[in-house]
Amino acid sequence: MRGEMMRIVENIAALLLVMLLLGCERSNPAGLENADTEVSPPPRGYVMARWNEEIPDVEYAGDCPFGFNVTEEDYFPEQWAVWMAERLRLRDQGGYLPWDDDRLPPDACQDPLAQPDPGFLTFDGPAIVYGLDLDGQNSRQLGAQGGSCAHDDFAGHTGERGIDNQSWRLMGCVRGYRPNDLIDRLHEGSTSIKEGGFALLMEISGMDDPMNDDEIEVQLLSANHPVTVDAGGDLMHDVSYTAHENTRYHNEVAKGKIENGILTTEPVDFRIKAKQQTMDNEFWFRDARLRGEVQPDGRITGIVGAYWDMANMFSTLNDQWIGQYHQGRNAAQSRGFMCAGIYHAMPRVADGHPDPETGRCTSISTALHFEAVPAFVIRPALAMAD
């Protein structure tokens, strides 16, 4: 009996030895069908430390030979004088007079057809601006090809032609949007981001080499909480942010590439949630594409070129509230334009997405500066699981 058991043990040992030898001869161990398969790199996350419209430096911005646009106070001086006197009287008594008071003309910021066109001044001359060529042509006012409306393109800082930025045509003769004025100073300090107005995230997937990679994917997502700043007021790197719980703000993934440190993407639409000061709204950009430079410290800086939906642009400029009181008129007054003027001027400068029935363009080309710093992007499902 004992001899029989010994033979069984010897047979099992021999079988195990054969299996081991056969396993060693295989090109790949069991369970690894392709040991040479490369593992995809983990996604890289970023948060925007800068995100603002292009306002050219003063030496490149061009001139407004007919001056700047007027405000309602300039256009309706008698009614505004009566309203202001009553406003100051009530303020001294601890009261408040709303901006849509009957002493003023009908509020065109709430109903843009409530006032006539005041003759809004657009910027019609040459300028040197940052931006991208969105339509693939050096457009001229005398004509346009399919997919756009006639407009004069700008020149870029490296001599390139065909830069599409009709937003500067619209706002270039508004005093508050001129170089070194109100909006430019707010942009310089990234005020809207740092004060908690919005946090915009970016995630890049498939980036094997930050300097050269012929196939990456880029996605922009709104965050559900403000950015984190250090004691000096600068955005902190490598902070975790949770993406917005509403997937409406998890935008379409854009295919892209990196060549010699220059990142570019194909066009996609995206929406950005913003809740800052008197605005609770979203930005809607169409056919947006990025061109950025990867920096040695991991940041990415560059330009977004996009078409800003015209109706959305008017809404973000004028749909402002403090409690029950509409503040669009207040915002327009402080920046230096009339809502009726902006409304009537927008179709004149619009250059993208022609309406199939009327042929009129419904979006306005724009350029935005961005600076993305390394961060960790957490999806809402993962955040809840934690």
Model-identified regions with their sequence ranges:
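Generic secretory/membrane-interface signal
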Residues: 4-5, 19, 363-365
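C-terminal motif of bacterial Sec signal peptides marking the signal peptidase cleavage site
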Residues: 21-23
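Bacterial N-terminal signal peptides that target proteins for export
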Residues: 3-13
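Extracytosolic secretory-pathway proteins
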Residues: 27-386
